[in-house]
Amino acid sequence: AWAIAKENCVHADNAGGYSCLVEIESMEGETTRYLFDTGWNYDWMDTCFKREGIDNMLANGEIAGFIQTHEHMDHYWAFPVVAKYAPNIHIYTPNTFYPEGKDYIKAAGHVGEWTEVKKGLYPLQPGVALYQFECPIIFRVFGEMSLYCNVKDVGLVSITGCCHQGIILFADTAYKELKYEKDKFYGLYGGLHISPFDDWDPKYDDLVIGLKKWNLERVGCNHCTGLITAQKFVDAGYPVVKGTARFRSKTTNYLGNGDVIKFPA
């Protein structure tokens, strides 16, 4: 499948993209892992998975499910790497995928269970749920999923791939539709899609200011958030968890390759 994608790419060697491993500890002390998106370039993601041990986790069945947040190339085209190590893994996608996107999963060699998540809330396990936002996105993509986690004695932690639905809607949806510890929005992680190309518009300042009402205690950002946005978060006094920038990230304001964020700290 990657050979087809590579042939049709303008820049097939682009190593940009987004993928993260989510580890959730239950009330009984058991850890469940989900792989959240899978990046863009096959070779780069295979290298990263090997470096971080994701390849062995996939092969050994230590990752319970693969969550594909949306159909964009920088989150999805390296899926053949996932299928290479875990062709039977349970995958979750929005039910808005186009036929071509669905064919890519099959062409990659996936033969496991496949859940197509409808609009709204989809419980994954106690205290953890996906939410599918039906929103139009650039490049003929429609629909994106995010993850909400209710952390005991702490509050809500939200994880997003690109947040094309908008960061304010992302936060407001949780507040209106979910119940969580202390009625507290504790943490946020992922690509926040405010100014991904750093073409800052003064109206984006309203989005930065708008986050203040949630009194977040831990924020981790990267990918499409935008370098200017990340710096504005820092300047505004938000509790941004810094990365190491040891694998080509342009700033420590981003959590990059191999970096870790924990909720609570």
Functional labels for PLM-detected ranges:
Residues T31-Y34, A64-G65, N88-H90, L156-V157, ...:
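Short active-site oxyanion
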Residues D43-Y92, L178-Y189:
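Active-site metal-binding motif and surrounding structural segment of the metallo-beta-lactamase
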Residues T93-M145, K232, K242-P264:
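Metallo-beta-lactamase
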